[in-house]
Amino acid sequence: MKTQTLQKIKGYAYDKFSCYKGCQHGLDHALRVVNNAKRMVKILKVEKRIDVNLLYASCWLHDIAVIDKNNNVISSLYFHFFESSINKKHIRRVLERFPLSKSEFQTIVNAIINHPHSIPYRSLNRNGDIYLKILQDADSFDYISDERLKSFNSNRWYLTPISNLYICLVKKNIKYFLNYPELAKYIDQF
């Protein structure tokens, strides 16, 4: 993928996410997922085997469908359970704005549709392509990040003890929620 195309995708994500008021899937989340993916590329030593721009584009857009939902409990639950289906309907329209090859288009679509639910459902993609696997693991590491936990707890103080315990348990067992379980030993870098 051309760097120009990645910059257009990044700009689009910035514009869209800057308007979104949800605490769990905003611009900060997308940026953390991109940074997690960058760390993983280095740890896994795959820089020369993949198109990193294509990976980062997938990371920037992986939750773009969430900005079209209402920010309430019912809408959030619906989105959580049907995220793959919602992404499937939404992502193609988004990607048509950008000059992508057919292969780039399909790689991003596949990664975004199939990335949800490693945590808590262990719906992994170990047989998927590297773009999907890294995106899913980068998103999983953000799921257990201190920043995201603080964000969650700030709006739901009454759930703080339960959410803290839950995240602690997931962190201790993170290797079971990753396509690349060897990344678990680097948990402090994410």
List PLM regions with ranges.
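Internal catalytic-core helix/loop-beta-alpha segment
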Residues: 102-124
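Alpha-helix N-cap/helix-initiation sites
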Residues: 23-26, 48-54, 101-105
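Inter-helical turn/loop segments and adjacent helix faces that build the functional surface
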Residues: 44-47, 94-102
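His-Asp-centered metal-binding catalytic motifs of divalent-metal-dependent phosphohydrolases/nucleases
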Residues: 50-79, 83, 87, 109-117, ...
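An active-site-proximal "capping" alpha-helix that borders the catalytic cofactor pocket
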Residues: 33-40, 80-97
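Short alpha-helical hairpin
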Residues: 1-16, 60
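Divalent metal-dependent phosphate-bond-processing catalytic cores, especially two-metal-ion Mg2+/Mn2+ enzymes
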Residues: 19-48, 61, 71, 117-190
